[in-house]
């Protein structure tokens, strides 16, 4: 696992000049992905399925857009509806990326990847990491799962899917609109129009706003908002309301794709934030928290799973909940029930 994590090039989302090598490589990359997709669409490369419904949660941009909170919410909703979901993931950033394995809540992040460990910890669902998503899906079915969620698998065309959910960041959107490496796009933005559900992550939920389906102007249909209302001491003590920190200063740590979003959510709750942004998927050491002042340290749960080995009474994780409109869940579950009846699940 990279000790530094990954950082987003500034020119993807601002007016910074794009380096010449990136501009040269982008058309080459674009031709390669267009050819690859055409091979699958025309049947020259076979897609392979499993005998249960498959949901792919992904994005057409590189980097984080809110897929993990949505995946966690999706697993919880399916469990509530009587399904036994399993999650297939590549396990980005783990040390032995070529090894397939089951991920449990206590699996070391170096072996399972931060997001799969977080999903297992939050949901208790079966989680399988494998660079081959098809093999992961088959393993989940053999383990008794009656529905598979493929986390970040939109471009993994070898695995046949029944439902595609695109997630896009409501602030960054599709950046400069260019393909990798000149921009953030893994595929042309028009690819998102093929997805069954398009979710736009609008960030912080307000006390009065209810997620809804806005007019679809080609950019997301279903609003997703993120809420925080508690803090979990990482030394094992009981969770406390986030409001207890209102008016206080804290160190806020975020090693995610868009750290400022987390910092803004804390500030909106009246908390004085001393921000510490790390690269996405950063591997923490105790020394990273030598801030020179003994203030509470708040971090995302994705960061927290990597800090458990050296957690003390000063470290807190902030649970984050994805909120979507009721109509989204009704529409999705209705489609899944029809699929299940056809497949005999």
Curated annotation (Swiss-Prot):
It comes from the Bacteria. ATP binds at residues 61-68. Its EC number is 2.7.1.130. GO terms for cellular component: plasma membrane. Pathway: Glycolipid biosynthesis; lipid IV(A) biosynthesis; lipid IV(A) from (3R)-3-hydroxytetradecanoyl-[acyl-carrier-protein] and UDP-N-acetyl-alpha-D-glucosamine: step 6/6. GO terms for molecular function: ATP binding; tetraacyldisaccharide 4'-kinase activity. It is an enzyme of class 2 (transferase). One of its GO terms (biological process) is lipopolysaccharide core region biosynthetic process. It holds the Pfam family LpxK. InterPro entries: LpxK (IPR003758), P-loop_NTPase (IPR027417). It catalyses: a lipid A disaccharide + ATP = a lipid IVA + ADP + H(+). Keywords: ATP-binding, Kinase, Lipid A biosynthesis, Lipid biosynthesis, Lipid metabolism, Nucleotide-binding, Transferase. Transfers the gamma-phosphate of ATP to the 4'-position of a tetraacyldisaccharide 1-phosphate intermediate (termed DS-1-P) to form tetraacyldisaccharide 1,4'-bis-phosphate (lipid IVA). NCBIfam families: lpxK (TIGR00682). PANTHER family: TETRAACYLDISACCHARIDE 4'-KINASE, TETRAACYLDISACCHARIDE 4'-KINASE, MITOCHONDRIAL-RELATED. Belongs to the LpxK family. This is Tetraacyldisaccharide 4'-kinase. It comes from Xanthomonas axonopodis pv. citri (strain 306). The lineage of its organism: Bacteria, Pseudomonadati, Pseudomonadota, Gammaproteobacteria, Lysobacterales.
């Amino acid at each position: 696992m990279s000790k530094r994590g990954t950082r987003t090039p500034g020119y993807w989302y601002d007016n910074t000049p794009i380096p010449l090598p990136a501009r040269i490589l982008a058309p080459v990359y674009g031709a390669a992905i267009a050819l690859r997709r055409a091979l699958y669409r025309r049947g020259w490369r076979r897609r392979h399925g499993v005998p249960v419904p498959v949901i792919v949660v992904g994005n057409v941009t590189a980097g984080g857009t809110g897929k993990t909170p949505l995946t966690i919410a999706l697993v919880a909703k399916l469990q509530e509806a009587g399904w036994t979901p399993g999650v297939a993931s590549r396990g980005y950033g783990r040390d032995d990326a070529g090894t397939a394995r089951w991920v449990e809540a206590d699996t070391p992040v170096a072996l399972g990847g931060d997001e799969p460990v977080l999903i297992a910890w939050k949901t208790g669902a079966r989680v399988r990491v494998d660079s081959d998503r098809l093999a992961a899906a088959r393993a989940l079915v053999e383990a008794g799962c009656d529905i598979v969620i493929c986390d970040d698998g939109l471009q993994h065309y070898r695995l046949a899917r029944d439902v595609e959910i695109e997630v896009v960041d409501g602030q960054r959107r599709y950046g400069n609109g260019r393909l990798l490496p000149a921009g953030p796009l893994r595929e042309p933005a028009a690819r998102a129009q093929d997805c069954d559900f398009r979710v736009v992550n609008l960030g912080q939920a307000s006390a009065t706003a209810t997620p809804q389906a806005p007019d679809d102007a080609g950019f997301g249909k279903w609003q997703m908002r993120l809420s925080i209302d508690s803090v979990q001491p990482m030394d094992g003590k009981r969770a406390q309301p986030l409001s207890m920190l209102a008016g206080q200063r804290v160190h806020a740590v975020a090693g995610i794709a868009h750290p400022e979003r987390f910092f803004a959510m804390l500030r909106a709750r009246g908390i004085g934030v001393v921000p510490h942004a790390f690269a996405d998927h950063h591997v923490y050491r105790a020394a990273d928290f030598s801030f020179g002042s003994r203030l509470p340290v708040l971090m995302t749960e994705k960061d927290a799973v990597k800090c458990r080995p050296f957690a003390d009474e000063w470290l807190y994780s902030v649970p984050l909940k994805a909120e979507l409109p009721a109509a989204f869940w009704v529409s999705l579950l209705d489609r899944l029930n029809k699929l299940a009846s056809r497949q005999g699940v």
